[in-house]
């Protein structure tokens, strides 16, 4: 990219990220129209405006303090951070675990691999999905990994059924939350996974309607990795395919674009899919696929700086599975 194009891009980002807190009422009216928001009463509307105003102030502060990322008013801007996390994430501890997954310690220094790698460039990542108001990020991230495993093995992209996991996983809690490795274990216990078209997503818990005759993917085994060096995730990503990871989503809610260099690490509450890594302006970063639709972030993806444990990406063991 030449200097003129780079300048235009950067200038465009800065301009798009400029907000004036005094114009909050105008932004709020635009927000209501753009996202078709309706409230039950004037008091509820006032309550939502106050939250919106608080979020706008945070967006302005982030845009001033994080020069490599941009934050914006989006569909979540009338929700408190706590509301957004409770409605649109879903990583939580189940009451029991199966312990089928082998635990592997990755304590050797990272290999000298390529500076950049992205599974999307090999057409091994399915399209971005939208979990909606259902705490099933754990199912989406897990199945996103299995979808990529299938594409790597059979050179074909398929969409697997999150609803099957929501309804039929006896360890995790459907839209009320779950964990990544227990989802792999449940896939082994269920015997396979159906297509999304056979068992469509409903954004709610339902009765299990599993049909073993319609299974298209089975999980033979799973592993949990203790990663001693964050850089080691690169080797693992290249070796096993896209990896579901647990993060703290508190600071990504109003993300628009760019490389996040400041991301909270206070508690893991969301699951996303690590699909690649690269370097931009000497900043190494991870590429992560979210499940909040393509109208969020960079067409549904976001980027965070490497080697600072951004969003707590290294706090939890990462998991992978072998399919058949």
UniProtKB/Swiss-Prot annotation:
The keyword Cytoplasm does not apply. It comes from the Viruses. Pfam families: Inhibitor_I29, Peptidase_C1. It catalyses: Endopeptidase of broad specificity, hydrolyzing substrates of both cathepsin L and cathepsin B. The active site is at 137, 270, 290. One of its GO terms (molecular function) is cysteine-type peptidase activity. Gene3D superfamilies: Cysteine proteinases. Residues 17-113 form a propeptide. GO terms for biological process: proteolysis. Disulfide bonds join 134-175, 168-208, 263-311. Synthesized as an inactive proenzyme and activated by proteolytic removal of the inhibitory propeptide. Keywords: Disulfide bond, Glycoprotein, Hydrolase, Protease, Signal, Thiol protease, Zymogen. Glycans are attached at residue 159. Residues 1-16 form the signal peptide. Belongs to the peptidase C1 family. Cysteine protease that plays an essential role in host liquefaction to facilitate horizontal transmission of the virus. May participate in the degradation of foreign protein expressed by the baculovirus system. This is Viral cathepsin.
